[in-house]
Amino acid sequence: MSEKVSVPEIFGMNVFNDAMMREHLPKKVYEELKNTIERGEMLNSEIADIIANAMKDWAIERGATHYTHWFQPMTGITAEKHDSFLAPPSNGRAIMEFSGKELIKGESDASSFPSGGLRATFEARGYTAWDWTSPAFLREDAAGVTLYIPTAFYSYTGEALDKKTPLLRSCEAVSRQAMRIVRLFGNQTAEKVTVSCGAEQEYFLIDKNLYQKRKDLIFTGRTLFGAAPPKGQEMDDHYFGSIKERVACFMHELNVELWKLGVPAKTQHNEVAPAQHELAPIFEDCNKATDHNQLIMEAMKRISGHHDMTCLLHEKPFAGVNGSGKHVNWSLSTDDGQNLLDPGKTPHENAQFLVFLCAIIKGVDEYPELLRLSAANPGNDHRLGSQEAPPAIISIFLGDQLQDIFDQIEHGGATSSLQGGRMRVGVNTLPALKKDATDRNRTSPFAFTGNKFEFRMPPSSASISGPNFSLNTIVAEELQKFADELEQAEDFNAAVHELVRRTYVEHKRVIFDGNGYSEEWLEEATRRGLPNITNSVDAVQAFLDDKVVELFGKHGVLSSIELQARAEIRYEAYIKQINIEAKTMLDMASKQIRPAVVKYAGEVAQAIIAMKAVGMDTTAQEELLQDINENLKLLHEKLKVLEEETERAGALQEDNKTQAFFYRDHVFKAMKELREPADRLELLVDENSWPLPTYGELLFNI
């Protein structure tokens, strides 16, 4: 039985949060730091030294010996280098020091991380810079206790080399433009608008011993071979089902660690596929939520090992059952407590809500390629549009009530509501909107769910920075256009009504409340002119589109050079991932599957000879051997094809884009063709002779 835990006592105990700062810092220093955080100003060196010393003392009291600048390079995972607090010994005695300079800035080898050409190998210098909007924290593990300082990562010449920098820039951009709208509606108390975010994290748990017997899982995170088990998810008995004790023990330890780190882990349950689960936190500031999601994924992978399990975060670890995604819930809130996507109780609030809603609708319609790119990676190519995840077509679900209101506005003004009630916006009447007046459409990639939007496309293994900074920047752009127009209006109420009406009429093609899985929607989306980008290689082009380059440059989120670098990194990552998968398939097929099948076929042949010698009928055995031999021959042929295509891909002297397309069109195709005979052979060969743990063992042996 797990030990009893008092969540209020342990929550945030390993975080140098506001309470700890107030306790450990002089009042004047604390107030100056708070002002710096709230206003986004620079921190002077004297104050930094005091903060660093207090942070060090707090960490050492908790047993820390080292600190690290924790950053998020373009690998999609986090990076860290640990330094001890030990200063040069004096008179043979150890001294523990930590200066403001060490807190604020660090140095790392930028050439060893993906840079897309921004850094050559001989241009190694890169810097980490303290992000004081995300609190430092302590991590306890086998190495002891370490102070983690969230940081941004940039090059010697100032280009962003990480996921955090554009996110922070985009949060400032959307706050700047949202405040203009808020001011127009009379709010004089708010100082900034923050992006609220919460990411629902899906994952698989499998037995660690079985995991270690699968090279594909070890090297690629997904199974490259595997026949369907007798039972999958068709009984619908795993979703929200009783949580197995072994998994529950893992979840308990995970929750305790996350709560100590200030991560507001809230919901846990079984997901649709066997061995699949989900953790969802309470929504919080977008920057913290992004850091916390990285902590969640890292903790899942590490803590699963404590229970002899392995956590799989890949988007599609098993064919034939649902893969994993990450639903990103997104909204905007003022610092005086107003959710700008919450339909209000007064005409004033409802008008403001509709303006923000229209900005999002317009932005999603004008920049669908960018949102699609933000959800693109090789693993997600297996999910999107496959009857288990949203389609690759970007559309918005609003629900019947909002749809009805917009339809009425289009034709002159809304005077009734599907839910009843009325409201006034100036001289125009609109019905009152009630929270949770929308149903849930699980097939929609971008759905309004009462007081937030739920972006359901992002990959389970990826950082949520990309979806967030893309959406933030898109909305900042549309809010800027709206503010420019409304600030010049002579009749504000009339201008708001016309803006809402015009925006809906011009962009309603992106709104779809039906079944996103249907073939009819694919045809309808084509008629509407909505892009259907089916794979991550095609999606990368969005980084280089003129309108996207202009968008990010205009709002100071990413420069054209930084965007070009990110495109190169995406192409290169795809190449490397598919190359690793192809080589793993070649290794497994030639060294494990083929030898096992040959050996088993020999045993069957010997059995046929022995049975014939005593006059027994061998029809069944001969048919079995014939099936095995035909599939073994096909396996051998497809193995050679994949080997040739992989060699051709590696020998290409073209740019990364051309090489990535070759891997997609030739290598990936050859991989699928090799898998087919291998999976058929699994069903023909004695299970004791098959060299790999089967899907049945992997999915149901927890």
Where does each model-flagged region fall?
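Hydrophobic alpha-helix feature that most strongly marks membrane-spanning transmembrane helices
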Residues: 72, 90, 259, 305, ...
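Histidine-centered catalytic micro-motifs
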Residues: 69-72, 326-330
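Active-site-proximal loop/turn and secondary-structure-junction residues that shape catalytic pockets
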Residues: 47-51, 71-73, 101-102, 153, ...
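Glycine-rich, acidic/polar active-site loops that bind/position phosphate-bearing ligands
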Residues: 125-313, 322-325, 332-568
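Active-site core of metal-dependent hydrolases
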Residues: 10-124
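Short linear, low-complexity motifs centered on an aromatic residue
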Residues: 76-91, 108-111, 214, 221-223, ...
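C-terminal amphipathic alpha-helical interaction region
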Residues: 500-702
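Catalytic pocket of metal/acid-base enzymes, prominently hydrolases
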Residues: 2-30, 44, 126-131, 135-148, ...
